[in-house]
């Protein structure tokens, strides 16, 4: 387990097309790197853009030699990478009373899928087959570890490849991301991005966390129509689908039932065509709600180990909120006033015992 208090670099380093650029690293003014559980990580970096060059004083980076569309941008903390992607935008900033700046915006290679929109169908396929096919369409290596039903037909209707894969991932309770040129997809329980320990008053600077019943349900039922059997079908998911994730905590469904009574949800718009499809969708919907029962956002000392898919063990928060949480989003930040810090979101399905 990584300790968030370990020594870390004072500022990030910038690599362009695989080579460290000392001028950009030294001229970095602001940085933001965003990660989410939906994939498509993004980066925005701003640099000073005025100074001496070639015996004169002027703009440093508007010649598009160092910063250019399509170039590979990597952000590192020491030897660890926190972002790899391609430059998709260049922005000039001309503030009052300050020197000009240039900003680059970059996205990882899921931007290729975001920019490809199609209408097509897949017949007699599993979701894993679809992920592998779309990875192949974009020259990505598939690393897919997902289970689920086989579908008679799946339709991609005027959707980008990314939107379609996100839709399928939600349907089977999977997460999607890329690591360099590898397209990855797996269930949350199978995603292993390591663990980090953060203590309040040490590496954990601040945190707001709550157990909230507003969006909890005691069950979720999904109904549809079995075309071949010509009969209705349904599946009801309950607390049992997250029991393995509670870690001795008390679920939102259990507290909701005892405090306010049963609250059941019926979902009709998904229209599954087989019972396995209905089961996969109902269980996915229940898990997504249940996992957000205890959720929080905080600020911590920056470490490359604090990433989406990792588990963070929070300490010093008392019996209700101590313990392991899943990291659902991360935002690494840097500027001249506050240095490096990381904002992050966490969630888990269980409240600790008082």
Segment roles from a protein language model:
Residues 86-97, 188-192, 325-337:
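Short, compositionally biased
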